[in-house]
Amino acid sequence: MPIYHKLGTIPHKRHIQFTKPNGDLYYEQLFGTVGFDGMSTNSYHEQRPTQVKEIRAQYSVAPIIAKPNNIQSYRLRGFEVPAEDDFLESRKIVLTNSDCHIVLAAPRKSTTSYFYKNTDSDEMIFIHKGSGKLRTIYGNLDFKYGDYLIVPRGIIYKIDFDTEDNRLFIVESHAPIYTPKQYRNWFGQLLEHSPFCERDIRRPEELETYNEKGDFLIKVKKNDEIFDLIYASHPFDVVGYDGFNYPYAFSIHNFEPITGRVHMPPPVHQTFETTAFVVCSFVPRLYDYHPLAIPAPYNHSNIDADEVLYYVDGDFMSRNDIEAGHISLHPAGIPHGPHPGAAERSIGKKETLELAVMVDTFKPLMVTEEALKISDDTYFQSWLE
């Protein structure tokens, strides 16, 4: 996140002696991204962060592909994904390509017996149902319905839920997740026309420091496999850090919509971006106010991108028979648009209360076996009259 952040105690300069009260050194770690060119954080540890005692299990979590080359539109009933106790086991990859995984999860329990580190991907975790606390090596973030949690790759975390009925929409991105460049100046500051600003970004608080030795299980994801690593010290042993690479939260309810006299294109709803996809937030807003406006979107040939919409709440103006938790996939190569009657119904309406998250990928998405378990195979015919 291009906002400088500091928690805990740090020395006045980088890479100099920083000693404990007994005279021993704290252990400095540079956590960089994109080699030495991306955002980074310097942290200071009670113990060496390199002490691996054992490498135990190694197992694949790669998705099983059902349709590697797809041109069919799909509707997935996301709430039909069964709830499971374990956070990682509950994650079901429904759509994927070489740049990202799109995941549904319904974990019932907090992560108590292990820590997790995804070295493959930045994670965008959207909280559809549930609340709790994301506990990380860089401090804690409270979360609730409507929050996006952005966890850069390699950050060790646990997730604690206050509830058992939890529904998450997750995107794992092999490229870093940033705020949209059209909303930033050359310093990285969000501009006046941005639909959100730095005040809306929640940064970690409550830096918990544990100077403990023992056996600590960290599940590390690398190349779509999980490695069970036993570390000799508690990973949350940071006494202080500063930098730009840390997890943060942003509520979809703080996204300020951009409207116009006629229908505005999806880029005005953009919230995050990578080199491989964009994320948009559709939120309650006033409709278009031209006297002859048609608030429903026009038909669109997304010839260069697959469109994924995750429906959160409200009535989505352009679709029929869509419920909370549904996902629609409109693949590149064929046009999509409002369902029959949707455009006519929208005329004269003053506002919409819809809430949805859109992911547009620049490479085609493959459909997994997990997706077919919850799919409506006739959805592509729902535009027939």
What are the language-model segments listed below?
Residues 1-385:
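Jelly-roll (double-stranded beta-helix
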